[in-house]
Amino acid sequence: MKIKIHNKTNISIKYLTKILKKIFFFVPERQNIHIIFITPLKMKKMNFYYRQKDYDTDVLSFINEIDKDSLGDIFINLKKAQKQSQNYNHSLSREVCFLATHGYLHLKGYEHHSKDELKKMLIIQEKMLKKVDLDKKIISKNKKNNND
């Protein structure tokens, strides 16, 4: 799968671009996706406009119904991802890839309205992350990954 990355923040994402391309390299899709890094304010506005939720969130995804070559767009709140990576005591790379895979699964039709649905999504996400050594087991054993 090809991904196109857009950075609408003032935070450098060069190292994130490499790992995101690597994780989606293993996905056997012909369509591409866009991953867009945005600010908390932009995310809050989008969350309110599209979901009527008046707060910023970490990730939103939207299916692209116009361009048949594109599966959709994944918007990631980079500041929130930074905070969450610190709260969960893992690398920013893991958090961003976790959010990107989560958004991708939503584009593929997965939902998490129940605990079972969420568990199924989390298992798939961890399998995807494991392919680039960002799964939970690797991170907890290898503390040097926390230096992103």
Swiss-Prot record:
What Gene3D superfamilies does the record tag this protein with?
Answer: Metalloproteases ('zincins'), catalytic domain (3.40.390.30)
Q: Which domain of life is it from?
A: Bacteria
The UniProt entry lists the main location of this chain as: cytoplasm
- Tell me where in or outside the cell this protein is found: Cytoplasm
Q: Cellular component terms, GO, for this chain's entry?
A: cytoplasm
Q: List the disulfide bonds.
A: none
What's this protein's name?
Endoribonuclease YbeY
Q: What is the species of this protein?
A: Phytoplasma mali (strain AT)
